[in-house]
């Protein structure tokens, strides 16, 4: 089956960087490197007769979308690097596709109809990524994985990476946001877009509307980015507790927040900590930035049990966010606003900041 080719009409965008199409026999295809409305030759890359859908690449464009452009990267396209999904689409149209995915996931998983706009961030869709993980290539150089594969595409440069994140460059270990400097452990998590930290801090603070004296929980706190600015907003009469499960990130957070007496760092699993008697039973505001899989029921229930007046939920996966929004609704917290940011241009990924009250 792999390698077979079909002429298909491409439908709506799907969650994961593909568009949905059907063969004449009704077989569902998830087609990469295509755009809605195009007619393409799709070559099957994964699938057997018993599968509910097959994965495919658009290897020939028979009728092109007006939103199609020539990919700037020579490694983008079928069989190349798997990092970027939408280099063949105009930047504004990429954001439209991502907005459609967010709306569809909220409608399908949270039963919420919401018009979403994905906001552009930065001046360019290239040269934005400050952290990269390259793998050794057989030729002795560096490369990136192909899509859904362990095979390596050797590259000489990555066009979405900054000059300091090209192959052979040392990893990011320190970052400046506003007037604060953050220690970042080697290999630890840090927002990859160079403008993401300030963008998200501004969005979180705008949603949280913190007051002097507030008690704030910052869950999945990483190296303390949100906690640092929340501490400034609540003042020394307030309190910020930052909870992070990764020991190296928690150690960096303690260093980064050491000048803020109202901030405290707890190195612990978030769900277990919320269940423990050591955690406070109340909070005015909860900020959480869970991993891609989402917060899930145990954490959502633990957060809501604190009865905060506001929950600010940062999410990098629309489906996980929608599932969590549905869980919040079960606990009486409704989605009041949602902002989406194009922090991952050229890819299908998108960042959301949701306010629930």
Please tell me what each predicted stretch does.
Residues 1-4, 169-357:
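Rossmann-like S-adenosyl-L-methionine
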Residues 12, 56, 126-195:
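Non-catalytic substrate-recognition/targeting regions of SAM-dependent transferases
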Residues 41-43, 133, 217:
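Hydrophobic beta-strand signal
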Residues 1-77, 149:
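Terminal RNA-binding accessory module
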Residues 98-111, 163-164:
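A short, contiguous, amphipathic alpha-helix enriched in charged residues
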């Amino acid at each position: 089956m792999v390698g077979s080719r079909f002429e298909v009409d491409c439908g709506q965008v799907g969650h994961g960087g593909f568009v949905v199409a059907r063969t004449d026999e009704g077989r569902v295809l998830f087609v990469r490197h295509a755009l809605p409305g195009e007619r393409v030759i799709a070559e099957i890359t994964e699938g057997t007769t018993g599968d509910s859908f097959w994965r495919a690449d658009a290897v020939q464009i028979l009728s092109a979308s007006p939103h199609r452009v020539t990919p700037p990267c020579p490694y983008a396209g079928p069989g190349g690097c798997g990092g970027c999904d939408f280099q063949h689409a105009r930047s504004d149209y990429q954001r439209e596709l991502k907005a459609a995915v967010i709306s569809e996931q909220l409608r399908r998983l949270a039963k919420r109809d919401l018009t979403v706009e994905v906001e552009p961030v930065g001046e360019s869709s290239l040269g934005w990524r400050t952290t990269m993980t390259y793998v050794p290539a057989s030729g002795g150089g560096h490369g990136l994985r192909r899509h859904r594969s362990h095979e390596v595409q050797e590259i000489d440069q990555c066009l979405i990476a900054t000059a300091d994140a090209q192959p052979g460059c040392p990893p990011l270990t320190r970052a400046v946001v506003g007037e604060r400097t953050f220690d970042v452990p080697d290999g630890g998590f840090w927002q990859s877009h160079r403008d993401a930290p300030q963008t998200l801090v501004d969005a979180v603070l705008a949603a949280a509307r913190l007051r002097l004296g507030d008690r704030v929980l910052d869950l999945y706190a990483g190296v303390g980015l949100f906690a640092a600015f929340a501490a400034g907003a609540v003042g020394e009469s307030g309190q910020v507790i930052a909870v992070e499960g990764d020991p190296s990130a928690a150690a960096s957070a303690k260093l980064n927040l050491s000048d803020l007496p109202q901030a405290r760092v707890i190195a612990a699993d978030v769900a277990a900590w919320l269940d423990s008697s050591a955690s406070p039973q109340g909070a005015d505001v909860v900020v959480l930035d869970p991993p891609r899989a989402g917060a899930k029921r145990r954490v959502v229930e633990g957060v809501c049990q604190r009865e905060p007046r506001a929950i600010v939920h940062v999410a990098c996966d629309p489906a996980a966010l929608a599932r969590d929004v549905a869980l919040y609704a079960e606990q009486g917290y409704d989605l009041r606003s949602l902002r989406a940011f194009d922090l991952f241009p050229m890819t299908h990924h998108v960042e959301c900041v949701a306010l629930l009250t």
